Swiss-Prot record:
It is an enzyme of class 6 (ligase). The gene is cysS. Zn(2+) binds at residues 29, 214, 239, 243. This is Cysteine--tRNA ligase. GO terms for cellular component: cytosol. Monomer. One of its GO terms (molecular function) is ATP binding. The keyword Cytoplasm applies. The keyword Cell division does not apply. Keywords: Aminoacyl-tRNA synthetase, ATP-binding, Cytoplasm, Ligase, Metal-binding, Nucleotide-binding, Protein biosynthesis, Zinc. Gene3D superfamilies: Cysteine-tRNA ligase, C-terminal anti-codon recognition domain, HUPs.
Length: 486
């Protein structure tokens, strides 16, 4: 089977052929650290974490780099508002990033380079562009000559004449027009302003432009050409377009073999924004505070919600959608916990194979442009079967399904679940939710049976309703009462 990826640059799905066979160099644009991460960030970093996990499962050696933009107008504005420094704001929200994103079971990248730690590398790259005639200095600023890069616009599919200044709100809108030789030239270096952090440079004191930062950090950490460059779809233009212009003009090599972008997160069909009042941060959602008016949401339910849609498609966040994801996670979690609850009783050994047919189907889906939403169907097939077997074991004490077959099913579920970052253990408070144990449920059913025997039907109904509120469905029959979790 061949792993294929949709390439934004070529607008088609292509086989993954890395620079060095068996190894993947991957870079994803990180956050500008001036605020808490929101649902859009959650989607991006869950997606790239899962792609990384999948590539490793497929046998690749992956080096994954994700930067922090720790110098930016938004950071400076936040520092002024709070009466603090740029470094204090950056460090605070870098710590917050890790606190929030790790709750979603996102693995740490191999490295997190910061812009402020790569000023010399940025200077060097600008000087190369200047020597090649693709950059010019004026009044302490340095700009990129867009017209000197003939293929500018190849990633976004735009002609230079059709482009609009200020796209994504990040194209040097603070630069005065007379400084530029062309209206679409963009800043590589910005002259110092009073009261703002600045670094010495060949062009005088100043700070880097936004786009040059990623080009310099990629070159420093991964070399001239990487395999996969990831990010949100809103970064295609101008940020990624400008990265290509800078890096490829300087190095005379492709910056990335594959450009891959995840879709945007909508809230009730609208773009998420503070002005619309639908801006939700990760910690608000997980803790049930602030803009999120509902109950705290399980982190694994958030991860499941993200993976239920193909990564390139828009994702609409609604209360109903997240509630459905929570219910789906309960089903999956019950399957993932099956081995912990019944493995000893079934006499399982330490080692067990996975079911090759299911692993193959999962891989076929994943190899098709990371179709993790399709792969989830394999997990739910296993989880539902294990939940059914668990109910049989509770009620009858034994099952007709061979023990070794159940162990293979469970091991397959756990193995493939880990590929998607969907994991649960009995002792992990972040991955499990409080609720009634099997023993609690059986005790309540006995109380209900006693109430029915005494014709106390109001008490019987109360217990049924209590169990139903806890996600437990009762099935009465002449042979007795059976139950299952919803």
């Amino acid at each position: 089977m061949t792993l294929t990826i949709y390439n934004t640059l070529t607008r088609r799905q292509e086989p993954l052929e890395t620079v060095e066979p068996g190894k993947v160099k991957m870079y994803c644009c990180g956050v500008t650290v001036y605020d808490y991460c929101h649902l859009g960030h959650a989607r991006s970093y869950i997606v790239w974490d899962t792609i990384r996990r999948y590539l490793i499962w497929r046998g690749f050696e992956v080096k994954y780099i994700q930067n922090f933009t720790d110098i930016d107008d938004k950071i400076l504005n936040r520092a002024k508002e709070q009466g603090s420094t740029m470094a204090e704001v950056s460090n605070r929200f870098i710590d917050a990033y890790f606190a929030d994103i790790r709750r979603l079971n996102v693995l740490d990248a191999d490295e997190y380079p910061r812009v402020t730690e790569h000023i010399p590398e940025i200077h060097q790259l600008i000087q190369i562009l200047e020597e090649k005639g693709l950059a010019y200095a004026v009044g302490g600023d340095v700009y990129y000559r867009v017209e000197r890069f003939p293929s500018y616009g190849k990633l976004s599919g735009r002609e230079l004449e059709q482009m609009q200044a200020g796209a994504s709100g990040r194209v040097d809108v603070e630069d005065s027009e007379p400084k530029k030789q062309h209206p679409f030239d963009f800043a590589l270096w910005k002259a110092a302003k009073p009261g703002e952090p600045a670094w010495d440079s060949p062009w005088g004191q100043g700070r880097p432009g936004w786009h040059i930062e990623c080009s310099a950090m990629i070159r420093s950490k991964l070399g001239a050409t990487i395999d996969i460059h990831g990010g949100g779809g809103d970064l295609i233009f101008p940020h990624h377009e400008n990265e290509i212009a800078q890096s490829e003009a300087a190095m005379n090599q492709p910056l990335a073999r594959y450009w891959t972008h995840n879709g945007m997160v909508m809230v009730n069909g609208q773009k998420m924004s503070k002005s619309l009042g639908n801006f939700i941060t990760i910690r608000e959602l997980l803790d049930g505070v602030g803009s999120w008016k509902g109950d705290p949401v399980n982190p694994m339910a958030v991860r499941l919600f993200v993976l239920q849609a193909h990564y390139r498609k828009p994702l609409d966040f609604t209360e109903e959608a997240i509630a459905n994801a929570e219910n789906s996670w309960k089903t999956l979690k019950e399957g993932l916990l099956f081995g912990y609850q019944y493995g000893e009783k079934l006499g399982w050994g330490q080692e067990s194979a996975i079911i090759p047919e299911l692993a193959t189907r999962f891989q076929e889906l994943g190899d098709d442009d990371f179709n993790f939403s399709g792969g989830l169907a394999v997990l739910f097939e296993l989880a539902k079967e294990l939940r059914r077997e668990g109910n049989i074991l509770v009620h009858e004490g034994t099952t007709k399904t061979p023990s070794d077959e159940l162990q293979r099913q469970w091991n397959t579920l756990v193995t493939l679940g880990k590929v998607l970052g969907l994991e649960a253990t009995p002792d992990d408070e972040t991955l499990t939710q409080p609720g009634l144990s099997d023993t609690d449920i059986e005790a309540l059913i006995e109380q209900r049976q006693a109430a029915r025997k005494n014709k106390n039907f109001s008490e019987s109904d109360r217990i049924r309703n209590e169990l139903q509120a806890q996600g437990v469905t009762l099935i009465d029959s002449p042979q007795g009462t059976r139950w299952h979790r919803s």
